């Protein structure tokens, strides 16, 4: 059966051109049809292999091509990863994401990656990984280990992509998403706002995501975190309303997907984050760092949740785990500032 695109570029452009308050109203209506508007899914991201990446993504401090002062590290030991997962669960996260800075995993790494997935799943957490390009067999092995989600961002529109990355094609990214989907793993894929792209490019990114045969279950929208030493370090700041508008359009186009506020939250004030939740964002990364840049401290997130009347969402495997819920609400975790990193760098 042929796949028919759900959206056209002109339709998406019309959404971006709507008056902001009208757009937010529509996005909130769509959101309430599919989600509890007071619940936010909480994830933690750990860099399991940091730095020395051979790719040339211009936004990324982990690329070996740029002098950002980041020290390269080897793949973490399985038990180190699982200890971080235990801390994440104690802090209230329901999904544990593991990211590695490389173009693709080597076969010698696969047994360790499988053990990490199995260990995280044994704790009752959802497991997510972002490891770059996957082969069919690698995707299947991760699926067999129990991986719930695989993150592989498209970053921007096909037209603007070549200005940001030359070491991996757009089609390679789409092919990896297809292999992940075929293996039975849920897809997490989104992009970055602030790369120097136009509004048309933002529309083009969301068009690609929404028109996949099955849209991603999770759509992270990152605000560029400018890191000294990277080619995009001097880019203009992203206008908050432009970012909120992108969140709202993503919610309308992908009504059943989780839309995640990912990298860049440290740069957003409470009012901007609140408007993002109003626009339909319903997932965050929770922890002190996301790959090499700050993320709001846990207690700040909890204070904001209280102000807005939001609640952390539990996964099906954790439903009824009152202890886990209470831990999150009481913010008992001591921040582990050396381990949590920024999602936009993968």
Swiss-Prot record:
Binds 1 [4Fe-4S] cluster. The cluster is coordinated with 3 cysteines and an exchangeable S-adenosyl-L-methionine. It catalyses: (4R,5S)-dethiobiotin + (sulfur carrier)-SH + 2 reduced [2Fe-2S]-[ferredoxin] + 2 S-adenosyl-L-methionine = (sulfur carrier)-H + biotin + 2 5'-deoxyadenosine + 2 L-methionine + 2 oxidized [2Fe-2S]-[ferredoxin]. SMART domains: BATS, Elp3. GO terms for molecular function: 2 iron, 2 sulfur cluster binding; 4 iron, 4 sulfur cluster binding; biotin synthase activity; iron ion binding. Its cofactor is [4Fe-4S] cluster; [2Fe-2S] cluster. InterPro entries: Aldolase_TIM, BATS_dom, Biotin_synth/BioAB, Biotin_synthase, Elp3/MiaA/NifB-like_rSAM, rSAM. [4Fe-4S] cluster binds at residues 53, 57, 60. [2Fe-2S] cluster binds at residues 97, 128, 188, 260. Pathway: Cofactor biosynthesis; biotin biosynthesis; biotin from 7,8-diaminononanoate: step 2/2. Homodimer. Belongs to the radical SAM superfamily. Biotin synthase family. This is Biotin synthase. The lineage of its organism: Bacteria, Pseudomonadati, Pseudomonadota, Gammaproteobacteria, Enterobacterales.
